[in-house]
Amino acid sequence: MGRAPCCDKANVKKGPWSPEEDAKLKSYIENSGTGGNWIALPQKIGLKRCGKSCRLRWLNYLRPNIKHGGFSEEEENIICSLYLTIGSRWSIIAAQLPGRTDNDIKNYWNTRLKKKLINKQRKELQEACMEQQEMMVMMKRQHQQQQIQTSFMMRQDQTMFTWPLHHHNVQVPALFMNQTNSFCDQEDVKPVLIKNMVKIEDQELEKTNPHHHQDSMTNAFDHLSFSQLLLDPNHNHLGSGEGFSMNSILSANTNSPLLNTSNDNQWFGNFQAETVNLFSGASTSTSADQSTISWEDISSLVYSDSKQFF
């Protein structure tokens, strides 16, 4: 068993209300009131309407304090904020809006405000995404600028504090190279000196004695004995304490035609002076006094200068 019907549905009119029906219902309620019984009210007025339909028509449309027309922007914001907070509880939302019924609010929400809110949220979401993308782009640009600045500073530091290790075109001063080459090991200096002496001696002999070139084979022994005498490590050149000069070599080997001329003696003296000036850094002189410089002095200069250099 269910609840008894409020009216005879066969004799009840359905559909929209006419202006005459609205006027009858409004005038009766304003004069007599509802009486607390909406079921018996249609029979008293003479309307072929259901009691529920009369109640809803009065509450939603015919009351004197109801607002008709569109919703203001402030009302829309209140409806949206309350809907996001409590959902579709229209009676509670209508209590916050004087003059608005829950039915009007629900209809307005479903027809217009819902779409408007969705579009607004979509636009805000797009704007937030755009702002986030712009922030990401700005952060990337700042990061790239920082990387460029750091790399530039590192390059400046490398160019300021890094010594060029692989520069093959660096020009070393000639004076330093000459001094370095002059203070080499004596075992490497002696053969070069002897070779130069012999070569210059041959050139001088060809100029002074053109027929001497034919006797080169006979003079080779003299050159060899002179070279071996200088290069022999077992021979004590400086052990006797006496000056081992070029004059002693000239007097010892009298058979050689190279040592019998005054020009040769003068050439050996000049060569000694040039050799001493080469190791000491002084200018070359060809005076007759420098011809008395001994090989002992040359050896002492070579050893002392090489020790100081190394």
From Swiss-Prot:
Transcription regulation in keyword set: yes
Record-linked SMART domains: SANT
Pfam family name, one: Myb_DNA-binding
SUPFAM superfamilies: Homeodomain-like
Main location: nucleus
Molecular-function annotations in GO: DNA binding; DNA-binding transcription factor activity
Stored CDD domains: SANT (cd00167)
DNA-binding region: 38-62, 90-113
Domain of life: Eukaryota
Function in brief: Transcription activator. Positively regulates axillary meristems (AMs) formation and development, especially during inflorescence.
Protein's recorded name: Transcription factor RAX3
Lineage: Eukaryota, Viridiplantae, Streptophyta, Embryophyta, Tracheophyta
